[in-house]
């Protein structure tokens, strides 16, 4: 990026709440159902059908607001946002405008240079989702299963300055939503969607440049790529003496470029007004306090606790926290065998890589937490060596068998019997008299040679420490 300029970035994120039913009716929320099967007169916008607020969705929105350090208002108002689109059967969307549920929050980011940065949250409000248009050839099909699904719209202040910060913010937000238990926040399933507002200005300037919106970018990587391209594009326009046009653009992952869509609507275009079918949403202070009291552990709290409770490094704790299910797997394994350092090493350095190679998520892992704990125990108690452990964990991923089963079936138990190892070392000494002589003369590196010979003979099953000790003792006797 040109050093003369800085980017000013704000994000609008739609998060689908993980409720069983829709925002204003009793229809099921279900990903991948047959088109137009989860619909009723309310979400189809039939005349005379009246909305009823989903209490669980309001609870989730309050929980999310608290997790984002927002101030939750005791009164908020549902408003109609009017626009015409085939997937919006009522001709308006029920949202919140002048009086949102929550305002004035913040999220703290850990930047790669070690600094911390606060991104302020302007507002969080509740709304319903639209349906989905599916384009097939020259036809457009409309699926209204998604219409009426509960959403939260989270709007940041324009505090973000780089494409990387935008990606880090979204990753952190997804994590907070998952930890708070309000959304799976899976971008691939459309449970988290992001619109980007970006402008540029000369470094040090307090004025805002002309804002461009990039719509519906559907992965964190693409958010970063779209911003990198768009910032560069705006700088080039200004450098060549032109003016950035206020517009809505779309990002094409194939080309890595943004393209114009339509002129950006102003809020007036939506003709917001309070929804006459819904009374203002009043939330009692006691209910907010009760939700606050029962808040689950959030990512930053877990990060601190993992370091304190288990003695993990920041790097290890970071990996476990950034993938909630991986953190849950680790803690479950430690419950079965209290060896956190060993478990985290095998989890991060071995198991996750093996699962990634097979395209399996930790939730679908054939290796259960108690089995990873058992493997670490077998190594700790010197039943098998670390080297054999590597083979065993591969087999565990392939077959789903327990480590004990594999060790038993394949006869992989470590040989720790000194007499058995002594006999072996004597035979190897007989085969390599010259090397024995050199070792006696003090050529220490030959210890490694003899350990290697024993390991080869036992197919890696001899305990290397015992082998080392026996070699040192026997060489004195020769």
UniProtKB/Swiss-Prot annotation:
Keywords in UniProt for this one?
A: ATP-binding, Ligase, Nucleotide-binding, Protein biosynthesis
Write down a Pfam family by its short name: GatB_Yqey
The EC category is: ligase
Record keyword tRNA processing present:
no
Task: State the EC number(s).
Answer: 6.3.5.-
Which reactions is this enzyme annotated as catalysing?
Answer: L-glutamyl-tRNA(Gln) + L-glutamine + ATP + H2O = L-glutaminyl-tRNA(Gln) + L-glutamate + ADP + phosphate + H(+); L-aspartyl-tRNA(Asn) + L-glutamine + ATP + H2O = L-asparaginyl-tRNA(Asn) + L-glutamate + ADP + phosphate + 2 H(+)
UniProt feature coiled coil, ranges:
none
**One of the GO BP terms on file:** glutaminyl-tRNAGln biosynthesis via transamidation
Named from the GO MF annotations, one term is: glutaminyl-tRNA synthase (glutamine-hydrolyzing) activity
For this protein, the record's InterPro entries field holds: Asn/Gln-tRNA_amidoTrfase_suB/E (IPR017959), Asn/Gln-tRNA_Trfase_suB/E_cat (IPR006075), Asn/Gln_amidotransferase (IPR018027), Asn/Gln_tRNA_amidoTrase-B-like (IPR003789), GatB (IPR004413), GatB_C_1 (IPR042114), GatB_Yqey_C_2 (IPR023168), Gln-tRNA_amidoTrfase_suB_CS (IPR017958)
Kindly state the subunit structure of this protein. Heterotrimer of A, B and C subunits.
- Please report which protein family the annotation says this sequence is part of: Belongs to the GatB/GatE family. GatB subfamily.
Recorded hits in PANTHER family, A to Z, give: GLUTAMYL-TRNA GLN AMIDOTRANSFERASE SUBUNIT B MITOCHONDRIAL AND PROKARYOTIC PET112-RELATED, GLUTAMYL-TRNA(GLN) AMIDOTRANSFERASE SUBUNIT B, MITOCHONDRIAL
Q: What does this protein do?
A: Allows the formation of correctly charged Asn-tRNA(Asn) or Gln-tRNA(Gln) through the transamidation of misacylated Asp-tRNA(Asn) or Glu-tRNA(Gln) in organisms which lack either or both of asparaginyl-tRNA or glutaminyl-tRNA synthetases. The reaction takes place in the presence of glutamine and ATP through an activated phospho-Asp-tRNA(Asn) or phospho-Glu-tRNA(Gln).
Identify this protein by name: Aspartyl/glutamyl-tRNA(Asn/Gln) amidotransferase subunit B
Q: Origin organism of this chain?
A: Aquifex aeolicus (strain VF5)
């Amino acid at each position: 990026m040109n050093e003369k300029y800085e980017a000013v970035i704000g994000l609008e994120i739609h998060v689908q709440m993980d409720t069983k039913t829709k925002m204003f009716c009793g229809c099921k929320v279900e990903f991948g159902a047959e088109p137009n099967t989860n619909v009723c007169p309310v979400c189809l916008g039939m005349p005379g059908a009246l909305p009823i607020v989903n209490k669980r969705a309001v609870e989730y929105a309050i929980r999310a607001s608290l997790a984002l350090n927002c101030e939750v208002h005791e009164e908020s108002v549902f408003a109609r946002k009017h626009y015409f689109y085939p997937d919006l059967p009522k001709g308006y969307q029920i949202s919140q405008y002048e009086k949102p549920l929550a305002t004035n929050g913040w999220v703290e980011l850990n930047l790669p240079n070690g600094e911390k940065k606060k991104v302020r949250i302007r507002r969080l409000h509740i709304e319903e989702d639209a349906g989905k248009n599916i384009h097939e050839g020259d036809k457009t099909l409309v699926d209204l299963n998604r219409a009426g699904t509960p959403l939260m719209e989270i709007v940041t202040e324009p505090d973000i300055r780089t494409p990387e910060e935008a990606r880090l913010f979204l990753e952190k937000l997804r994590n907070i939503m998952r930890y708070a238990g309000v959304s799976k926040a899976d971008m691939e399933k459309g449970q988290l969607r992001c619109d980007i507002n970006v402008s540029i200005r000369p470094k040090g300037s307090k004025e805002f440049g002309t804002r461009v919106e990039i719509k519906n970018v559907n992965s964190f990587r693409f958010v970063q790529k779209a911003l990198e391209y768009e910032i560069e594009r705006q700088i080039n326009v200004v450098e060549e003496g032109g003016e950035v046009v206020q517009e809505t653009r779309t990002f094409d992952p194939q080309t890595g470029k943004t393209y114009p869509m339509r002129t950006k609507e102003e809020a007036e275009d939506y003709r917001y007004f309070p929804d006459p079918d819904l009374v203002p949403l009043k939330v009692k202070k006691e209910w907010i306090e009760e939700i606050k009291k029962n808040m689950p552990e959030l990512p930053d709290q877990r990060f601190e606790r993992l370091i304190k409770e288990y003695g993990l490094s920041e790097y290890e704790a970071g990996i476990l926290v950034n993938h909630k299910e991986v953190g849950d797997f680790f803690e479950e394994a430690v419950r079965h065998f209290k060896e956190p350092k060993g478990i985290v090493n095998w989890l991060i350095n071995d198991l996750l890589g093996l699962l990634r190679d097979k395209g399996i998520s930790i939730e679908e892992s054939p290796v259960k937490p108690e089995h990873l704990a058992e493997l670490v125990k077998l190594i700790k108690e010197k039943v098998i060596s670390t080297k054999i452990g590597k083979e065993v964990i591969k087999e565990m991923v392939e077959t789903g068998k327990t480590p004990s089963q594999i060790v038993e079936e394949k006869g992989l138990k470590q040989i720790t019997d000194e007499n058995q190892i002594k006999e072996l070392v004597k035979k190897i000494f007989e085969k390599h008299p010259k090397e024995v002589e050199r070792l006696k003369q003090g050529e220490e590196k030959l210890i490694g040679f003899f350990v290697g010979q024993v390991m080869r003979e036992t197919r890696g099953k001899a305990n290397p420490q015992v082998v080392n000790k026996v070699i040192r003792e026997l060489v004195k006797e020769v």
